[in-house]
Amino acid sequence: MALAVTSSSTAISGSSFSRSGASSESKALQICSIRLSDRTHLSQRRYSMKPLNAESHSRSESWVTRASTLIAPEVEEKGGEVEDFEQLAKKLEDASPLEIMDKALERFGDQIAIAFSGAEDVALIEYARLTGKPFRVFSLDTGRLNPETYRLFDAVEKQYGIRIEYMFPDAVEVQALVRNKGLFSFYEDGHQECCRVRKVRPLRRALKGLKAWITGQRKDQSPGTRSEIPIVQVDPVFEGLDGGVGSLVKWNPLANVEGADVWNFLRTMDVPVNALHAQGYVSIGCEPCTRPVLPGQHEREGRWWWEDAKAKECGLHKGNIKEEDGAADSKPAAVQEIFESNNVVALSKGGVENLLKLENRKEAWLVVLYAPWCPFCQAMEASYIELAEKLAGKGVKVAKFRADGEQKEFAKQELQLGSFPTILLFPKRAPRAIKYPSEHRDVDSLMSFVNLLR
């Protein structure tokens, strides 16, 4: 795997960020840079304005040296005013993505870049083009992307006349990970370690050469982790060119845009898209950790499907997760209840224990173990309620058991809980519950499961 990463990097020339348009040199003097100084609040930055005279990198430079870091021109520090990015985010709350992109590029010039993942965030590049301003694009090549994603990279470069800056993982770190744990260790002990080596550390190197970056995050992508992302913020996790906490600004122009609207924009503007989208993929990452979503599933359920909803961030946007594992269980109490229907029985822990004890039941029971804050539970709510209506009076009780918080350990030990949602069928004459094995949570699939085993 280390050899694959190394060989792929040699195939791509240049590591300084690409610029859009042949007029970038003439515009360089008009672009201003921003220098960070001491601050008292993370939402504020002190900056000074100075004309930027950037010299392009010589093509004779070693690509290894240039790929290891993104070098931004140095500027002198001068006294300046304080900018409050929390207030700016509020001002831009009703702004269009185009307005937000224009503001970001105007403010940071060539010290800001678009993070491109090879999915629908190609919309960011189109918005940048529409501003008429120079822009830069970078992407993380983990060495394990789908072929369709690499083809999209090529199509985007040709469409916009740019060179995407590809950042690669450290070959030594990848080699150590694979030799010690194998190629697919993330299926057994979680994806965080692999993502840290292949994505987070390369991103950290990239951002150290910038003062701001632009992402394609949307609030509707993951209610569990992204529901509160602002239009613009001081990055809570990564450092920028000037170093230290608060030295990097993060822009999210699509934060308030729904996925359907993004796709309407892409179709209208005839923008190249990843061929995987036509195969049912929505959220696209590395090949082993990405799959198509199914009816009744949330788009992020196509990523790291073997893990809980709260774990479905790779670390690039870790600041979205405001609570750690233990704290997450204390949050759901304030979340609106789901699976509310006269045909769905709400079970207590005692009720579940009784089901476990019975070997001969008068009726079969179908029980969903859920957490109301889980976006994947929310996504199957309509299907489950419809199923309950169809099974009413037909010898199968449909129920729910809230298995987060204090009940989580009990559910893990006694009810086969691995992730939310978990669906169990307690047959009429069987001592053990049968766990629904599929990710298909549409009405027909669930009904077939019940009818075959009831």
From Swiss-Prot:
Highest taxon, organism lineage: Eukaryota
Domain Thioredoxin span(s) in chain numbering: 333-454
Record: transit peptide: 1-66
Protein's GO biological process: cysteine biosynthetic process; sulfate assimilation; sulfate assimilation, phosphoadenylyl sulfate reduction by phosphoadenylyl-sulfate reductase (thioredoxin)
UniProt subcellular location: Plastid, Chloroplast
Pfam (any one): Thioredoxin
Upregulation: Induced by sulfate starvation. Induced by cadmium.
Activity regulation summary: Stimulated by sodium sulfate > ammonium sulfate.
Protein name: 5'-adenylylsulfate reductase 2, chloroplastic
InterPro entries: PAPS/APS_Rdtase (IPR004511), PAPS_reduct_dom (IPR002500), Rossmann-like_a/b/a_fold (IPR014729), Thioredoxin-indep_APS_Rdtase (IPR004508), Thioredoxin-like_sf (IPR036249), Thioredoxin_domain (IPR013766)
Organism of derivation: Arabidopsis thaliana
Domain free text: The C-terminal domain may function as glutaredoxin and mediates the interaction of the enzyme with glutathione (GSH). Active in GSH-dependent reduction of hydroxyethyldisulfide, cystine, dehydroascorbate, insulin disulfides and ribonucleotide reductase.
